[in-house]
Amino acid sequence: THVFNRGYGSGRQLGYKYAVRKGYRYVIQMDADGQHDVCNILRIYKELQTEDENGALPDIVLGSRFMEGSSEFPVSFAKKIAFVWFRIMLKTGTGRRITDPTTGLQGLNWRTFRFYSKYNNFDDKYPDANMLMQMLLLGFRVREIPAVMHVRTTGVSMHSGLKPVLYMFRMTFSILAVWIREKILKMDEDKIRELEKYNE
């Protein structure tokens, strides 16, 4: 555990390191505010083990609030703008359309969380759409499924008020930096080759 609060991203990365140390095959993560229904856990777990038409398994499964079959979920106007903008950036940068680029409901296989556990591979502040840009450009297979969500009944979102606007600007620069790093500078290709040395 961390002896003091090091932030959202650092907390998640600590969980990935724990999963690597324990030899887990999958990690399923969800927000701690009660908005993600526990029924999503089994759905994501099954999807991680489901091959596509080409016989490939996903590396990352996203629980989407905006796919057909998802439960209705109210979103503020500011957040809607951010979602649309991040979708455009991901589509432009990777060719993939992701309906919910900031979802915290995700399932990861061992390749993904082992990669995330390494230094400088994971944003220790706000790992969201920027991580999807990175993983898609590195060739990780990302799949989305509809999710069951609940409206927050207590507490305050870390993206409340004007925070979504500030977050949108910060994430935009982070996504651009990731695109340059992976698409132009190709800085992480050696890390992927190293990752392939591991067997399940």
Give the label of every model feature segment:
Residues 129:
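DNA-recognition element of transcription regulators
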Residues 170-200:
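Terminal low-complexity segments of carbohydrate-biosynthetic enzymes
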Residues 96-97, 120-123, 132-150:
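Catalytic donor-sugar/metal-binding loop of nucleotide-sugar-dependent glycosyltransferases
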Residues 3-22, 26, 38-125, 152-162, ...:
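Acceptor/aglycone-binding surface of glycosyltransferases and processive sugar-polymer synthases
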